[in-house]
Curated annotation (Swiss-Prot):
GO CC annotations, alphabetized: Ndc80 complex; nucleus
Taxon lineage: Eukaryota, Fungi, Dikarya, Ascomycota, Pezizomycotina
Gene encoding the protein: NUF2
Any one GO biological process: mitotic spindle organization
Similarity annotation: Belongs to the NUF2 family.
Protein's UniProt name: Probable kinetochore protein NUF2
UniProt source species: Gibberella zeae (strain ATCC MYA-4620 / CBS 123657 / FGSC 9075 / NRRL 31084 / PH-1) (Wheat head blight fungus)
Highest taxon above the source species: Eukaryota
Assigned keywords, A-Z: Cell cycle, Cell division, Centromere, Chromosome, Coiled coil, Kinetochore, Mitosis, Nucleus
Record's function text: Acts as a component of the essential kinetochore-associated NDC80 complex, which is required for chromosome segregation and spindle checkpoint activity.
Amino acid sequence: MAYNPRMSIIPTSQQNSRTRKKEEEADAFMRLPDREIVGCITDIGITFTVADLQKPNAAHVQQIFEWFAELLLNATRETVEPAMRAAAEDIAGEYADIIPSDTRNLMGFYVSLRRLLFECGITDFSFNDLYKPTYDRLVKIFSYLINFVRFRESQTAVIDQHYNKAESTKTRIETLYGENQENEGRLEDMKRNRKAMEAQVQQKTMRNEELKKRLLELRRNQERVAARLEEAKQKKGELTTALEQKTHEKVTLKQESTKLRPYVLQSASDLQENLAELRDILNNDKSHIDALDRRARALQTSTDSFSVVSTDVASCIKILDEIASELAKEEEELARNAKQRDALSERSNNAREVERTETMLKRQLSKWMERTEKLREQSNHKAHEAKEKMHELRAIHRQLTEEHTEKGKEMEVRRVRIEQTEKKMLDLKENIENEVHSAHEEYRKMEAHIKLYIAEMEQAIA
């Protein structure tokens, strides 16, 4: 017993009688005289008399209800038929034609009319009111409808204002949703392009690193070749000085031999001794000539190696030119990547702002819908609700101004960050340009040194 709900002391019959009395009092308050009802219906363009109200005709009553539905709900046969056809196709599928179109349209019209009358205050509307109308029921329904229309006409300005705001918010939401979809598509495309560009940049950086390693190896080989060339030049100078000394000694020996010839012819033993000496000298000269030939051959091989080195240097120069062109291309690609990244950040920021505005508009729309429902339900307290709405609108305005200021601050912070990143990119670009310029200067110096070495080699060979 402890868990059972508390039972009322008043009997149910008394409660039902009280509710009936309240309903009867409300009906009596809302009930209009027959002539007033007939006059209002005839004013809308439908012929209707007191006799038609007292002895109603189902077709005539349905015509009046159709006019009220068209006036208050914009529900006509043209608007109801497509929706009911789609519903029949969803339910029955291929057998949708089994349900007649008249019954479908009647069901849709009945649902919309019942919703309208429920908003007017009639909760017990049924098909009997359409097909078997009675005098009391028609007077009650028409009285409630006419009072609702009068109230609606008295509040047309407020209703139109809220309706226009709701429509504007709906159109704004639709446009923002479309823009959001477009921006999402663009953002996906830009993400794909960014991934592709990042892959290309990684490939270019790997290739650049490989080229840098190759360039360092070529520089080392060039230094080695230059050292070997200097050693060969030194050896060549030493050999040329030795050859000059030997030729000078040979000339002096020939002169001495010519001077000593008449003295040698005096005796055979002396001649034999002189011959032996001359043979020794001749053998020494031959060995010396052979050594000189060997040195000449070594010099020839060194000149051949110098020619090979010159071809290697020319290939190195071509590779350096290619590297410079590729570096320029990479700089252009880096600039394009930077621009695309900036565009991506801007579009992502725009998409976020659109989403924020969309959420704000949805919240505002829900608030406006709740307010319109409150206006319909609380018609007796208009002034108080208007004051509350003014306070709420001021609060919303303050919130919007605060959000606007916050967004402005965020935009300024983002702009400062973008400017800082642009400055960093410019500094990096200047550093890269300085490195490229220094590399070009080193390359020119090396080219000048190589040309000097080649010119000296040609002079030495000549």
